[in-house]
Every structure is written in structure tokens, then in C-alpha cells.
Amino acid sequence: MGRGKKMSKPGDGRSGDVPETCRTGGTNENHPKMNGEVVHLGQPKIYSYMSPTKSPSGRPPLQEENSVAHHESKNLGKPTTETRKKAEVEKKRISSATELSVKSSKQRETECNSIGEYFQTKQELTDVQRNTALTPVDKLQSQKMVKNKSQRRKAQRKKSPNRKLTDYYPVRRSCRKSKTELESEEKMRIDELIQTGKEDGMKMDMIIGKGRGVIATRDFQRGEFVVEYHGDLIEITDAKRREASYAQDSATGCYMYYFQYLNKTYCIDATRETGRLGRLINHSKSGNCHTKLHNISNVPHLILVASRDILVGEELLYDYGDRRKSSIEAHPWLKN
């Protein structure tokens, strides 16, 4: 009697014949539970009504097909569980991507709404500023504030010492010369050379086919004074009379140079033999020198200036400028 409770006999139901999904938790045939197995959703209630003891011949075709699929899914075991896990992971990935797309669309909508609100608020502020004009009292107050600020700044500037460049460096005179000063110095130098009759940087030499000529003994830069064409300064009437007398003697050369000065025609007559070299410079249309008038105390002087850089040993040449037929007939070398 006191030996304990009697164990109830196990039921006659065959444990191997009933599906595992129906054994746990009672025999609830209408609502079978899943325990880690994949059950096809085609007709889930068919499995609970099927009995494994029935022969396949007595089953309908649909029941037979579902039972075969059910047994195959039970026999899969571990691969079926992995497939289910993969399906769950894929489902989670799709749901997360959907949530992200929904969130991004919501964020875009929120940003668009915030931008629209910003521009609307800005427009309202500008409208308010336009509508609310300053009163005369407010204008006076703002002007006073600006004046006070400017006065404060001026006071600060007065307090701070104004430093000059001379506080750090001593004043010194510039050594540079202006263009006018340089031109004035050059004129004074030429005046001195003309008045003294000094002729440096050249010598007289015999030129083949020409006779006497002048050769440079030093380099001359372009625009530099070379020599004066020295002779008698006479007016046009005297020049014509002398030229007629010189034409009677064929041995006399042509050393007369005509020019205009202050709307008046003058002539430099260098026919008389002197020791000056300017009168011996030969003619050439492509010479390396050209003539220029130089004024000394309102008296014109004819000088020769370098047209280009002249090297040592070059013959000094310039264009006489006489293109008259009579002159060319008398002196054919004027053509060159």
C-alpha cells in the first residue's frame, strides 16, 4: 500500500508510426506544431489525417504526393535547417533594405521640407524688414552711434604714434638722374666737343675705289655723337654763287650740304681743305651714320650720329641726300 504510486501503462499508440510533430505536447491533430522542421504550406492539415498504416493504393493521388514530400522533408535533417536559416537571413536582408529605402525617402522628404521652410522664413523676414521702415528717431540714434564709433577710432589713432620711414632710415638724396638731366648733360658734352674741335675714335685712310675715307678706331653705340661736319655756314644765295664757281673747276670736289633751319635754307660749305675729318666721310645710301642739327646759342651745327652700333675698323658712311639729275651726272657714285 505504501510502496508508492503505480506507474500508468504507456499507451498502445506506436511511437514510430506517429509523426514527431504530433507527439510533443499532446495529440492536437488539428493544430500540429513545428519543431525545427520545414513543413510545406500547400496543405498543412493533410499530414495529421494521414495514417502510415494505410497502403499507398488506398490513398488519393494528392495525399500520396503530399506524404512523399513530407517524408522527404523529414529525412533531409540538417540540410533542411540550413536552408531555413538561409531563407530567414535573406528575408531579414530584404526587410532591412526596405526599411533603409523607406528611411532614406523619409529623410529626403524631411530635408526638402526643411529647405522649403528655410526659404519661406527668409522671404518672410525680408518682407518684414521691407515693411518695417526705421522711424526718424531710430535713424537719429543709429547716426549718433556711428558718429561715436568714428570719434572713438579717431581718438585711438591720435593716441597711437604715427611711425614714419624716416624714423628707421635716414634721409638720403637719390643718385638717379631723370631723362631731362641726362639729355642736358649729353648736350653739354657735345657742345664742348664741337667748340673745341675734338675728334676722337676715328682716322683718315685710303679706300680702294673711293680715295680718302674715315675709319672708326673704337666702337660707337647707336645714337652716339660721332663727329661734326665742319665748314662755313652760309645762306642759300651765297651757296648758289659758290657752287657755280666750283663747277668751273673739275678738280674741285663737292663738299656743300644744304639744310632747313627755322624755315630758312642754309648751307655748310666744307670745300676748303682743313684738318677736320667730318668733311672726308664718304657717301652711301645704306650708311652707318646720319646727319642731325645741333643748336648752340641759336647757331645750327651739322653733326653725324651713329645709326647703329659701329665696330672698330668699319668705314664711316652717310647718305648725302642729293638726288638731282645734274648732281648724279656730275658725280655717278651718288647712285650707290
Curated annotation (Swiss-Prot):
Span list, region Disordered: 1-107, 141-165
GO cellular component, one term: nucleus
Localization per Swiss-Prot or TrEMBL: Nucleus; Chromosome
SMART domains assigned to the protein according to its UniProt record, in alphabetical order: SET (SM00317)
GO molecular function, one term: histone methyltransferase activity
Record-listed E.C. numbers: 2.1.1.-, 2.1.1.361
One Pfam family hit: SET
UniProt-listed PROSITE patterns: SAM_MT43_PR_SET, SET
Polar residues biased stretches: 95-104
Record's catalysed reaction(s): L-lysyl(20)-[histone H4] + S-adenosyl-L-methionine = N(6)-methyl-L-lysyl(20)-[histone H4] + S-adenosyl-L-homocysteine + H(+); L-lysyl-[protein] + S-adenosyl-L-methionine = N(6)-methyl-L-lysyl-[protein] + S-adenosyl-L-homocysteine + H(+)
Group of enzyme by EC: transferase
Comp. bias intervals (Basic and acidic residues): 67-93
Domain SET: 200-321
Keyword annotations: Cell cycle, Cell division, Chromatin regulator, Chromosome, Methyltransferase, Mitosis, Nucleus, Phosphoprotein, Repressor, S-adenosyl-L-methionine, Transcription, Transcription regulation, Transferase
A GO biological-process term: regulation of DNA damage response, signal transduction by p53 class mediator
Gene3D superfamilies for the chain: SET domain
Record-linked InterPro entries: KMT5A, KMT5A-like, KMT5A-like_SET, SET_dom, SET_dom_sf
Residue runs in coiled coils: none
PTM info: Phosphorylated during mitosis.
Protein residues bound to S-adenosyl-L-methionine: K210, G211, R212, Y255, N282, H283
Annotated family: Belongs to the class V-like SAM-binding methyltransferase superfamily. Histone-lysine methyltransferase family. PR/SET subfamily.
PANTHER family: N-LYSINE METHYLTRANSFERASE KMT5A (PTHR46167:SF1)
Known function: Protein-lysine N-methyltransferase that monomethylates both histones and non-histone proteins. Specifically monomethylates 'Lys-20' of histone H4 (H4K20me1). H4K20me1 is enriched during mitosis and represents a specific tag for epigenetic transcriptional repression. Mainly functions in euchromatin regions, thereby playing a central role in the silencing of euchromatic genes. Required for cell proliferation, probably by contributing to the maintenance of proper higher-order structure of DNA during mitosis. Involved in chromosome condensation and proper cytokinesis.
Protein name in UniProt: N-lysine methyltransferase KMT5A-B
Native organism: Xenopus laevis
